Each structure stands twice: as structure tokens, then as C-alpha cells.
Amino acid sequence: MRKNIVAGNWKMNKNLQEGIALAKELNEALAADKPNCDVVICTPFIHLASVTPIVDKAVIGVGAENCADKVSGAYTGEVSAEMVASTGAEYVILGHSERRAYYHETVEILEEKVKLALANNLKPIFCIGEVLEEREANKQNEVVAAQLASVFSLSAEDFSKIILAYEPVWAIGTGKTATAEQAQEIHAFIRSLIADKYGKEVADNTSILYGGSCKPSNAKELFANPDVDGGLIGGAALKVVDFKGIIDAFK
């Protein structure tokens, strides 16, 4: 059976000391009130080796926000999947809309990143989603289908290790909001694509997270949908009270 997951994406926020403090505070809150879902925090690279040992791995998984598409070598500024795994991190976000937009990550680059993450026993949280122009042109289905090419080259066994996150890029920071119905509609479509490629059992066991503007106030409604298995949380993951409010939507 697929897992319900709430994953926090800290993005480029929190210096090292602030990140350690946030991880400790979250760890204490969840130790006192155990979650009914898997909880993951994906932090900047510099936090990983410090945050991983201070959280209870039975309650909180730790991940990176990216990794390189190369194994090792003369790639100044890059951090490999092997390096991420060596910190004790278990997860890595790949294909986030910000990486696609600002760093021009292609289907081919992301395919390499996914393979290297899996080779180092990391669990990829693979992001897909359409921008405003694509949504207004009603092209969201073909956009996410094209983006899934980065992971649809995998064997069924390897694909089963992937967590998907749908980001309605058009609804993030634009003042427009995606309804719970819109979220369910596209999540169901994504699951149907997985079923067509890998069969119903694999599709039924794939967690698909919602990466829109998820808050404590709307999480319960979003997560009540049959094909929404949790959230990839940005801003609300930077405050324990907000992040825990979203986690508690599964109670």
C-alpha cells in the first residue's frame, strides 16, 4: 500500500545554525505527538551532515533538494548523489519547477540525476507540473506526460522507488489557486499514466504528493482526495507550527 508523505522543501533558506534549530524543534514536536504519515525534510546541502544525526530517523527522514547529473570529477560547485548519501540523507528532490526554470534542467539531465540517485539508494521525490500559459492552453496533461519521460525509462522495480510530486506552477505565488478538485483530477491522470506504463499494482503503490500552496487551512481538504497522498511543502515547512499543522491533516 502506498504511503502518505509530507515533505518539507526548505529551498535556499536558513543558515546552518537556524537549520539545526528548526530540525531540533520539529523533532521534539513530532516525538511528543507522533505523525500518522511519513515526514521528510529536504534541506540545503550544507545542513545535511548536521541535521541527519539530530533527528529520529523513525519519525523524520532527511533529504537534499538536488544532486548532480555526474558521478564525480571536475564539476566545480556540484554535489553528487554519492556525497548526499554519505551524509545519511535518504531522499532527494529532483526536477523541481525552480530547477527546471532557473537552471534549465532537461528531461535528459533529470533522467541522469534519477539514475544516480537510485544507484546511491536515495529515494527521489520527482517533481512535475505545468506553468500558467500551459494551464490556460489546457496543455497540463501533455506537459506532465512529457516530464514523466525522465522516470518512465526506468524498470518497474526502479520506478517503484520513486515518489512523485505534482506542482501546479501556475498556482504558486501568482494569486491563483488550484482547487482540491483540480488537484485530484491531475493526480488521477498521472496515476493513469503510471498504470498504462507499469500496470495497476505499481500505479496503486506510487505516492503522488501535491506541491501547490499547501497550508494547515487547506491540507485536510487536499489530502482527502483519493489520489493525493500528501504534500511537498515550501514556505510552510520553515515554521514548525505550520508544518505540523499540515502533518496533522492526516489525523
From Swiss-Prot:
Q: Which GO terms describe its cellular component?
A: cytosol
Matching InterPro entries: Aldolase_TIM (IPR013785), TIM_sf (IPR035990), TrioseP_Isoase_bac/euk (IPR022896), Triosephosphate_isomerase (IPR000652), Triosephosphate_isomerase_AS (IPR020861)
In which compartments does the protein localize?
Cytoplasm
Question: Could you say which protein family the record assigns here?
Answer: Belongs to the triosephosphate isomerase family.
Catalysed reaction, written as an equation? D-glyceraldehyde 3-phosphate = dihydroxyacetone phosphate
Positions binding substrate in this chain are N9, W10, K11, G173, S213, G234, G235
The family database entries (Pfam families) matched by this protein are listed as:
TIM (PF00121)
Q: Spell out the molecular function terms from Gene Ontology.
A: triose-phosphate isomerase activity
* Subunit-structure text: Homodimer.
What does the record give as the active site?
A: H96, E167
Question: What does the record list as GO biological process?
Answer: gluconeogenesis; glyceraldehyde-3-phosphate biosynthetic process; glycerol catabolic process; glycolytic process
Question: EC number(s) of the enzyme?
Answer: 5.3.1.1
Q: What is its main location?
A: cytoplasm
Q: Does the keyword Isomerase apply?
A: yes
Matching NCBIfam families:
tim (TIGR00419)
Swiss-Prot/TrEMBL keywords = Cytoplasm, Gluconeogenesis, Glycolysis, Isomerase
Q: What is this protein's function per UniProt?
A: Involved in the gluconeogenesis. Catalyzes stereospecifically the conversion of dihydroxyacetone phosphate (DHAP) to D-glyceraldehyde-3-phosphate (G3P).
Q: What is this protein called?
A: Triosephosphate isomerase
Q: Would the keyword Isomerase turn up in this protein's UniProt record?
A: yes
Name the pathway: Carbohydrate biosynthesis; gluconeogenesis; Carbohydrate degradation; glycolysis; D-glyceraldehyde 3-phosphate from glycerone phosphate: step 1/1
This protein's species is Phocaeicola vulgatus (strain ATCC 8482 / DSM 1447 / JCM 5826 / CCUG 4940 / NBRC 14291 / NCTC 11154)
